[in-house]
Amino acid sequence: MVIVDTSVWIDLFKGRESGPVAKLEQLLAEEVDVFTTGLIVQEVLSGIKSGKEREQVRTDLGHFILVMPTLDTHAHAAEIFGTCRKKGYTIRSIVDCLVAALAFEYDLEIHENDRDYRHIAQVFPLRIVGSA
């Protein structure tokens, strides 16, 4: 079970060839349970200019399992952000902290192309696809 970060979805939908995109295509072909959350969907859709393309991507992302953060999830995300900062890691996106908190809550690996998660994994036992 995996939650896919915005960075990988954007590369996929823009047709960029990369290792993370190839791995995502492999995960989809293997019918691995793929999770997302509203903020990931929002970030992906925010970068699409065409209304028609935005609707298609929204439909595509709607096929995956949507997990919803609770107040406790948000508090955990804030803890992740603060603890990483204390340990010398600047996390650029609080959304990444929220996605990490969801990964812990739902026992998910994160498939990413974003150094914030690798920084979080230096402080917390975050499971990242391909890093085992």
Residues of each region from the PLM?
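Conserved glycosyltransferase catalytic-site signature
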Residues: 6, 38, 95-97
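Short, hinge-like loop/turn segments at secondary-structure boundaries
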Residues: 51-55, 84-85, 127-130
